[in-house]
UniProtKB/Swiss-Prot annotation:
InterPro entries the UniProt entry points to: RidA (IPR006056), RidA_CS (IPR019897), RutC-like_sf (IPR035959), YjgF/YER057c/UK114 (IPR006175)
Domain of life: Eukaryota
A single GO molecular function term of this UniProt record: 2-iminopropanoate deaminase activity
Transit peptide: 1-58
Protein keywords: Amino-acid biosynthesis, Branched-chain amino acid biosynthesis, Chloroplast, Detoxification, Hydrolase, Isoleucine biosynthesis, Plastid, Transit peptide
PROSITE patterns recorded: UPF0076 (PS01094)
CDD domains listed in its UniProt record: YjgF_YER057c_UK114_family
GO terms (BP aspect): branched-chain amino acid biosynthetic process; isoleucine biosynthetic process; response to toxic substance
Swiss-Prot/TrEMBL catalytic activity: 2-iminobutanoate + H2O = 2-oxobutanoate + NH4(+); 2-iminopropanoate + H2O = pyruvate + NH4(+)
Reported consequences of knocking out the gene: Reduced root growth and increased sensitivity of the root to added Ser.
Protein name per its UniProtKB record: Reactive Intermediate Deaminase A, chloroplastic
Site (Important for catalytic activity at high pH): 180
SUPFAM superfamilies xrefs: YjgF-like (SSF55298)
Amino acid sequence: MTWSVFRSINTPTLDLSTALRSTRTPLVAAGVGCATFAGVSLFRMSSRSPPFASLSVSASSVKKEVVSTEKAPAALGPYSQAIKANNLVFLSGVLGLIPETGKFVSESVEDQTEQVLKNMGEILKASGADYSSVVKTTIMLADLADFKTVNEIYAKYFPAPSPARSTYQVAALPLNAKIEIECIATL
């Protein structure tokens, strides 16, 4: 199907006259979320709300609360350790730093993964959540060859049913970290 904003697109005609009791009409799309197909509108204009109106989010109605704990490393830039909003907590990417020193626990991906997950646990606890309330994690690895090793450690903290997860190899991480994990949890 061809979609266009504010203009019609002519494509080969389709004969649906028997089924739709209409003449042969080209497939026409006008605007996002509405189309005319063989003379039949797929989006009915009415006095009701515009399409997708229920998906809008008003920033003024969302109450945000900053989560901060000294039991996890401080943010390395202008961001929060976590934010609570709408019964969810959003944790920023966490590194394998020792909170008291700001230094990596070691250069090994195993030790950094353990420390990342411990730091995440402290931030989750400060927000009123825990590992069992995590619904989504995103893991960023400096080397995807560490995937299996990270999975073995990760499974100790997130037994089945595990949260939804994405894992990516990235070009670089802050402070040349081996791993960074962010997550979303319910409250």
